């Protein structure tokens, strides 16, 4: 690879990207360190050339009528040359590009050149021409280039508009014909599943086929082999119209059942010879969105195999700014942490790129339903005839590639555009509103009706159903709620709303100090308001906002490490307020998808897992508040009423109301215990009650008034027991944490085999176990505990150099 102006050739990996090649050969500094992002961005003012010489042996393709050069992904604008002949120009990162090259290939050595054009120059020229507006955190003109928008900067992402050949390049030989697409539809009825194959065959020119003795498409047929999860194979010959699966094993989301997968193989045959094969794994399930008018408005819930399921998860963004660093193993690790935290859903946000096949393979295996946005976000687009043709093929390519996956729950038109276009945000001319409707309510539905009519389509997120009909209506469809954080409202604000499906809501925190130390080598920069820390905070004023919320809840930390710890507790408690409230109101609300799961670089953001895969407090909280059976407390306290203690009539209610929610297909009988305790954990009052919790339900207990409780020196603990084990627990205080009179819990920690044991002499709030030497993932962390011992299993990592702290230490 080289900068074509400098002709400084360096080795490059394919699949790969320009930045990764430059970084590996010392041609650029780490773009994540300090403000090196500026230097990295400037490098993309240039054009770059990839060049390779490969051997082509005619004997390997002797039976082929045509040879295709296939690019699964080029980022983004490129000219492609084979042996000096221009094959074409490409301009869409999200498409698959194929070129017939049979007549250009030479037996022996061949030269392939791909010239990647500057995305910055293209966007600048397009903006000058069209003046379209979009997200202010990104490069002007980003909407005119079918490139992952986050690369141009976002309010959590660096501006690193990389380029390259980020997916495989292959030579495909076609003998007589090939399978253009295979669509396996499912019919679920009376406990049986029928598979209905729709097979499209692309034939080579009939004259060429006849010259080889075939009679074109008339001589072609396909055979289907279905391999059950236990390995049993069933074969259907002669182009079957349908295949009945006996004793079908259904696929379920995580927490509701298993994820058995059937392998379907379609062999295209010309006579007795197999000329092409399609092989994928599918899950047998009926999956759609349930919408029904009700007393509050209209329901919006995932319906799986006849059951309405509460969606629990987070919004997924691309895993790295440098795509060469992504891998199946890295994605597996991230999605495994979702399963560990009891997710059943992830939403793929529309400002990135359509995920790799392996992303969906892993979601199929792990039981994670995928809300899949089309790749449009926070902008308006110029719908020229050329742009329309380009995105239509983009839709076709990705729908055909992903539609067979069991985990694909719905397609969604875009991120936040219906809402903002209705408000007039970014709109500069009337045609932009018309074009919006054409794109998301005509073009995409047309393509889906042809290529994937069985998957539910939703026009935007948020939306109430489209056509600018009150998007973000709390009583219909999905909602993005940002009054907490962007609107500076307190966490108690969450409890004022009963959204049908919350697909975005969030709160920021700092990642671990260990993560932040990778972006600076100056200890003075480890300060919330230093240049480097604010350079790695892309939501303007975000660090100050964290501090503002912090002063309301906690005493101001004395050091940076405690500041990071307190910021993570704020984030975790804020999202907990929302999720527990939504789950307590199951039936009315049927989804809690927080913003966001992950990061694409080391940054202060809304994520629950940072760039290096380290869990923040929020991810441990998520493991608890997404538990299949969860006990939670709706308390009334000083915090919930936002009372001012300096007012003349300062008073507030002190009460608890417990709730058990059950997101399983089994009824549960649980013993709920609660107690009023002093700060040394001594019990002052305790009660218990057996509770029957039906399948897929939330059950309230009676409200308990606690007018005499000392809000500075007493707290309530609560536990849910089943089969003599605690399955869910927590505590609640009735003042702000900064006012509560915590005793020194005298925390001590030791290792006992594969467990860590924490001992406390008094009530300890939000106990953090951390390892200064190695990354740890634990069965539980950032937990509340009464006096005594608490044992936590080690899931990953080595427990060397353990430290422990609680809110008392802030």
Model-predicted segments: where are they?
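Soluble or luminal CAZymes and related metallo-dependent hydrolases
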Residues: 46, 330, 390-394, 435-440, ...
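Flexible loop/turn segments at secondary-structure boundaries
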Residues: 76-78, 120-123, 290, 318-321, ...
């Amino acid at each position: 690879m080289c900068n074509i102006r400098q002709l400084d050739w360096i080795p490059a990996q394919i699949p790969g990207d320009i930045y990764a090649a430059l970084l590996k050969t010392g041609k650029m500094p780490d773009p994540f360190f300090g403000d090196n992002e500026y230097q990295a961005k400037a490098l993309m003012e240039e054009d770059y050339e990839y060049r390779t010489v490969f051997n082509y042996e005619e004997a390997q393709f002797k039976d082929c009528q045509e040879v295709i050069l296939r690019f699964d992904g080029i980022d983004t604008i490129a000219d492609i040359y084979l042996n000096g002949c221009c094959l074409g120009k490409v301009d869409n990162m999200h498409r698959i590009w194929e070129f017939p090259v049979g007549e250009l290939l030479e037996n022996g050595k061949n030269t392939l050149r791909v010239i990647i054009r500057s995305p910055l120059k293209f966007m600048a020229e397009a903006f000058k021409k069209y003046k379209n507006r979009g997200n202010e955190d990104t490069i002007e003109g980003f909407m005119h280039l079918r490139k992952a928008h986050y690369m141009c900067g976002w309010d959590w992402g660096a501006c690193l508009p990389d380029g390259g050949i980020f997916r495989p390049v292959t030579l495909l030989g076609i003998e007589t014909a090939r399978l253009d697409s295979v669509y396996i539809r499912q019919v679920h009825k009376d406990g049986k599943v029928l598979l209905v194959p729709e097979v499209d065959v692309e034939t080579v020119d009939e004259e060429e086929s006849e010259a080889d003795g075939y009679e074109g498409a008339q001589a072609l047929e396909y055979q289907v082999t279905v391999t059950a999860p236990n390995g049993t194979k069933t074969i259907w010959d002669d182009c079957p119209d349908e295949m009945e699966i006996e004793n079908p094993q259904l696929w379920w989301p995580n927490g509701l059942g298993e994820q058995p997968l059937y392998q379907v193989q379609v062999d295209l045959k010309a006579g007795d010879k197999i000329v092409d094969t399609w092989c994928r794994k599918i899950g047998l399930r009926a999956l759609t969105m349930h919408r029904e008018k009700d007393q509050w408005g209209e329901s919006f819930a995932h319906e799986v195999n006849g059951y309405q399921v509460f969606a629990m998860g987070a919004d997924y963004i691309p895993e790295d700014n440098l795509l060469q660093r992504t891998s199946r193993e890295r994605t597996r690790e991230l999605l495994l942490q979702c399963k560990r935290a009891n997710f059943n859903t992830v939403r793929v946000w529309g400002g990135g790129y359509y995920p790799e096949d392996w992303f969906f393979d892993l979601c199929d295996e792990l039981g994670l339903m995928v809300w899949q946005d089309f790749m449009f976000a926070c902008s308006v687009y110029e719908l020229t005839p050329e742009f329309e043709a380009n995105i239509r093929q983009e839709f076709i390519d990705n729908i055909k590639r992903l539609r067979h996956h069991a985990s694909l729950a719905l397609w969604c038109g875009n991120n936040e555009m219906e809402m903002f276009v209705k408000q007039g945000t970014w709109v500069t001319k009337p045609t932009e509103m018309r074009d919006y409707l054409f794109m998301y309510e005509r073009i995409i539905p047309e393509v889906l009706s042809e290529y994937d009519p069985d998957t539910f389509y939703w026009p935007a997120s948020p939306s109430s159903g489209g056509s600018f009909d009150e998007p973000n209506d709390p009583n219909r469809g999905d909602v993005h709620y940002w009054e907490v954080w962007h609107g500076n409202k307190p966490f108690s604000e969450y409890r004022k709303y009963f959204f049908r499906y919350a697909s975005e809501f969030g709160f920021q925190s700092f990642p671990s100090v260990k993560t932040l130390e990778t972006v600076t080598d100056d200890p003075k920069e480890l300060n919330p308001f230093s240049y480097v820390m604010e350079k790695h905070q892309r939501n303007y004023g975000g660090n100050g906002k964290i501090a503002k919320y912090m002063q309301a809840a906690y005493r101001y930390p004395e050091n940076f490490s405690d500041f990071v710890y307190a910021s993570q507790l704020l984030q975790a408690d804020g999202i907990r307020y929302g999720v527990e409230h939504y789950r307590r109101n199951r039936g009315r609300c049927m989804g809690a998808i927080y913003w966001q799961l992950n990061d694409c670089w080391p940054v202060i953001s809304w994520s629950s897992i940072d760039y290096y895969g380290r869990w923040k407090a929020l991810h441990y909280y998520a493991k608890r508040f997404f538990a299949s059976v969860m006990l939670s407390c709706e308390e009334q306290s000083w915090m919930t009423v936002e009372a001012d203690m300096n007012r003349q009539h300062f008073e507030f209610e002190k009460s608890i109301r417990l709730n058990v929610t059950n997101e399983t297909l089994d009824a549960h009988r649980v013993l709920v215990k609660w107690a009023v305790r002093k700060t040394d954990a001594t019990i002052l009052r305790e009660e218990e009650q057996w509770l029957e919790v039906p399948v897929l339900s939330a059950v309230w207990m009676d409200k308990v008034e606690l007018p005499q409780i000392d809000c500075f020196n007493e707290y309530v603990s609560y536990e849910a027991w089943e089969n003599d084990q605690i399955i869910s627990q927590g505590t609640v205080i009735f003042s702000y944490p900064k006012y509560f009179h915590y005793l020194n819990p005298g925390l001590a920690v030791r290792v006992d085999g594969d467990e860590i044991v924490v001992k406390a002499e008094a009530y300890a709030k939000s106990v953090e176990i951390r390892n200064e030497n190695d990354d740890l993932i634990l069965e539980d962390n950032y937990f509340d505990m009464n006096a005594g011992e608490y044992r936590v299993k080690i899931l990953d990592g080595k427990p060397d150099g353990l430290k422990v702290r609680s809110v008392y230490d802030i």
